[in-house]
Structures are given as structure tokens and as C-alpha cells.
Amino acid sequence: MYKCALVLAAGQGKRIKSDLPKVLHKVCGKEMVNHVIDTIRKAGIQDANIIIGKGAELVKERTEEKKVTYSLQSEQLGTGHAVQCASEFLKGKKGTVAVFAGDTPLIKESTIKNLFNTHIEAKNAATILTAIVDDPTGYGRIIRSGNEVLKIVEHKDCNEEELKVNEMNSAIYCFDIKLLYESLSKLSNNNEQGEYYLTDVIEILKSAGHNIGAVVTDFEETIGVNSRAQLAQAEEILKDRINLKHMENGVTLIDPKTTYIGIDVEIGKDTIIYPNNIFEGNTIIGERCTIYQNSRIKDSIIKDEVDIQSSVILDSSIGNNTTVGPFAYIRPESKIGEKARIGDFVEIKKSIIGDGTKVSHLTYIGDAEVGKECNFGCGTVVVNYDGKKKYKTIIGNHSFIGCNTNLVSPVQVGDNTYIAAGSTITSEVQEGDLAVARAKQRNIKGWVDKKGLKK
């Protein structure tokens, strides 16, 4: 049977108080609307249409990789009106359509599958995803007669008895496409809000003698984000889910409450994560690594048995058995080899560092290719920028760079070379050479007495 989905993403979200469309606010590193789309796809629904409105072009830009189609709701006149705006998407289709809110990032793949299966097996015209809550204030109520679903009543339109109902509408549904399409023209805005409610389709279908079903799920999954407080709540719930998944897969989190792992991050077994670490984007961390406290790693590949202390690594790769930090900064497009050492207060930018090379402290390397088993003394600087353009430095294998050396790019240093401490290198150093580029020391005898500075 054909299955498709509509995602309602047209609202600005006034309560969240932001210039950014509400559905583009991120939870665990991913836009809420993209959480919904990705979960839909995992549940086996490939054909999805996003109803856009406020910030339409930005929403399209942030979702274009998802290969979805779009319908425009130029004026926000309710959820029913939003689905009416997708009429062209629905027209002529047969099968089942699910309707989701773009601000519900916690919905699970298993719940979506269960909703579809229940709907199809029961041959319902509509199936509502619901939850039981202690305080349903603000939510639409599921009105039943026994187990039979009669209708959904929005909170502001509830009478005294309906307000006592604690089964709430999640705003996630399955519909028979043909019956939904036919019902959209029958919607009315004769209500307190003056809006067209999608929930009224339930009563329209029921009045026509069609079956209406419901699937009850955990309230946590149905949380819609309408404020910064709810955004933080969703973040906390999803963070706990992610951390639990990694621990179940063999990763040790010393303090899960202070460990932030983005939803797309991968971590190998027997890796140990200390408190106050942040892993973002498409980061992959290998097996048997140790990440000590206060590190941030984003969009990077960390191979096996790597130790990292209090460092920042962005869009880079770190080879097996390498140590990084404390207080190192690995900037984008850097590649650190195996068994290397990047020490304290070292900055690497857009550079390749060979296997076994040691850059132990207080060094800047930018736009450089460094060979294997080199050693950098404290205070080395690759001078790669002349104020207009950045230049490249190439350093061969087994080179020794003395302390306080300036390598003025563009420059090439051959294999098995030595550079004396305090040198400023401006021209090529050939293989096997020692380069000394500093002023000769001169001692002026009796200078302190002559100047009257002796104490």
C-alpha cells in the first residue's frame, strides 16, 4: 500500500520569540523538522511533503537534502487550512497519509510504524496518535463513547465535561488519502479561533459512518516545542536517549548528565568519555579512545586508541594511537597521522601532520605538510600569511625544528634536516642540512656598571 506524509512547518512560533522559523531550532544538533523527516524515512515512508509558510525559503534551504516536496501556506489559518494547501500533493493518490507537526522531534520510528499498521489493519478512515496526561491543559481532547472515538475538541472549545478528559491529541494522524481529500472542502472556521481545524475532519468522517481509531503512546514522544523551555525539555529527553544508546553499545560515559552527544555521532566500544564533553555533527570516534574532560569535537574522525584532553577539534581527522592536548586547537581540514603527539597550546590549521610527529607545546602550524617522525620545539611558528595571501610550507620526514623557530612561508624543509633554535627560515633547507638563521651573540663587557644599573 502507498504511504506518504505531510509535515506541518508553516508557523513562525510566536512563543519561542525568534526570527528563525520554529521548526529550524535544533535539538541535539539537528533541526526539529529534519528530526521528523528522518524518523519518517526510517519508518519506511519515502514520499513526504512539507507545508511551509513563515521563512519558507530558509526552511527549504535547510531541508533540501531530504528530497521532499513543498506546499506553501501563505496565510496561517489553522492546521486544516495547512493540509488544504497540500491538496495538489494529495490529489489522485490512493493509500495512507500520515500528518505530523514539524515541531515534534521526539517521535519514534517504532511508534510511526505502529500507527500505520494499526490504521491499515483496522481499515480506519483516520487513526489518531494520543497520550494520557495528568494535566492536558492546552491540548485538544479525545472524546469517546466507551472505546469508540467520536471527535477531537480543541481546549478553547471544550465544555466543562470535556475539560476533564485527560486523553490528549498529539496532532499526529493517519488518514485514508481519498477520504481526507474529500473532507477538506467541508471544513469550517466557525470556532473561537476562527481557524480551520484538521481535528474537525475526524468528526466529519465519523458523521459519514467511517471508522476512527486511536493509538496511545507515551506523552514524551508527542511533546511539541512551542517555547524555549520546551526546547530545553526536548533536548534533555533526546540527549538521555542518545547517551543510553551509546552506553548500551559499549561506551563508558563517566557522567551522562554532563555529556553532550549529537544525534548523528558514532562512538566505538570501550571508549571512555569523561564529563563536560561535546560531540557534534557527523563525528566518528573509534574504539578504546579516552576523551578527558572539556573537549569539543565536531564533524571529525577520531580513529582507535586516541587520547584527547581539553581540546577543540573541528572538521579534521586524528590517526590511531595519537594524543591531543591539553588545550590544543585542531582547526578545519587538518589531518593528524598515527602515533602523533599534539600537545598543550598547539594550533593546527589546514595542515597534514605525519605519523609519529611530535608537536608538543606552544606551536602554530598553518597551511603546511609535515612528514613523519618530525619534532617541533616549543614556540615554533609557521608564518603563513603576508596580510593578503596564505602560503604553504612543506617539511620532510625526520626533521627537527628547534625552539622559537619561524618558518616564513612559502618554504620547503627537506628530510632529515635540523633547524637551530631561534632561527627565522626564509629559504629552502635541503636534505641532511643544519640551518642556522640568527644573529651571532655579542657580549659587551662591563655594560651594567657603565649604565649604573648594578644593584
Curated annotation (Swiss-Prot):
GO MF entries: glucosamine-1-phosphate N-acetyltransferase activity; magnesium ion binding; UDP-N-acetylglucosamine diphosphorylase activity
Chain positions recorded as acetyl-CoA binding sites: 384-385, 421, 438
Keywords, sorted A to Z: Acyltransferase, Cell shape, Cell wall biogenesis/degradation, Cytoplasm, Magnesium, Metal-binding, Multifunctional enzyme, Nucleotidyltransferase, Peptidoglycan synthesis, Repeat, Transferase
GO CC terms of this entry: cytoplasm; membrane
Domain of life assignment: Bacteria
Annotated positions binding Mg(2+): 103, 226
Signal peptide range in chain numbering: none
Pathway assigned in UniProt: Nucleotide-sugar biosynthesis; UDP-N-acetyl-alpha-D-glucosamine biosynthesis; N-acetyl-alpha-D-glucosamine 1-phosphate from alpha-D-glucosamine 6-phosphate (route II): step 2/2; Nucleotide-sugar biosynthesis; UDP-N-acetyl-alpha-D-glucosamine biosynthesis; UDP-N-acetyl-alpha-D-glucosamine from N-acetyl-alpha-D-glucosamine 1-phosphate: step 1/1; Bacterial outer membrane biogenesis; LPS lipid A biosynthesis
EC number per UniProt: 2.7.7.23, 2.3.1.157
Chain sites annotated for binding UDP-N-acetyl-alpha-D-glucosamine: 8-11, 22, 73, 78-79, 140, 154, 169, 226, 331, 349, 364, 375
PANTHER family in UniProt: BIFUNCTIONAL PROTEIN GLMU (PTHR43584:SF3), NUCLEOTIDYL TRANSFERASE (PTHR43584)
Protein name: Bifunctional protein GlmU
Organism the protein comes from: Clostridium botulinum (strain Eklund 17B / Type B)
The gene coding this protein: glmU
